[in-house]
Each structure stands twice: as structure tokens, then as C-alpha cells.
Amino acid sequence: SPLTYGGEQENSLVPGTYNSPACAGFAAALHELGNKDAQHLKNLYGHFVMRAREFDFIRVNTFGEHSPHIINITFDGYLGENVLHYLEEFGIYTSQGSACSSHSKKKSRALEALGADKRTADCSLRISFDFENTIAEIDEFFKVCTQIPQNLIRCYK
């Protein structure tokens, strides 16, 4: 027999009255965490873009309205797949193309919408941030990128 009765409004699964103050407190906490995380992601994005400007072979493709946790960049002249594997050697994991086309060998629709040609799409990587990422990790990414011209062959001039 059940320990408590009632809850017909919840298919007899949740008897009793909701703890409205606890629900409101939980919602406020989630909202606060969301704002804090969103600001952190925006800070990471801004730092990434600032650092990318230091490199003549790295171009940021993400402009206008965008998710602050995703950035698409082109390594001018270097195949994205080669850069991806090079970064993996240092424990840096990225993706090629856009999330919309991650399982497709065709040119990314998202990059195409940005006006990217095949060469740009071939040389692009997608970087995703998490609220646990740090500025120091972005700096490490660019430290590794300084070695790309010495270690990878340019496929495009």
C-alpha cells in the first residue's frame, strides 16, 4: 500500500503540494548559474578572437549573432583535417566543419551560408567552449598554433 495518498493531478504519482518556495529558489539558482556561465563563455570567445588576430594564417569566420561557445576558424593554406590531428597530439580536440555537417563529407551548409568556398571549408575547424574551459587553455591552444607553420605542409598557397 502507498505511503501517501493523493496526487491525482499528477497521475497519482506525486501526492501532496509542491514546495513553491523551494521551486522558486531552485529556478533563481539556475538562472544565476546560467548568467554566470554565459558571461564566462563570452569572455572566452572574446579572448580567443583577440588572440587569433595575432596570426596571419588564422581567420575567424564567426560573426554577428552567434553562440558564444562555438567559433569557426580557418587556417589559411592548411587542411583542417591535418591541423585537427596536429592539435590532437597536444591533447587539444576540435572538430572539422560545422556541427550541422559533422557526419557528412559534403561542404558544410553553415560555412556555405557564410559565403565560404571549398578551400575555406577544407581549411576550417570548429572550436567549442565549455563553462569549465579557461583563458589559460586558449593561450595554450595558440601556443601550439605558433608551431603549425614549422610542422605542417601548406596545401594551398
Specify the residue positions occupied by each region the protein language model found.
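Pyridoxal 5′-phosphate
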Residues: 1-157
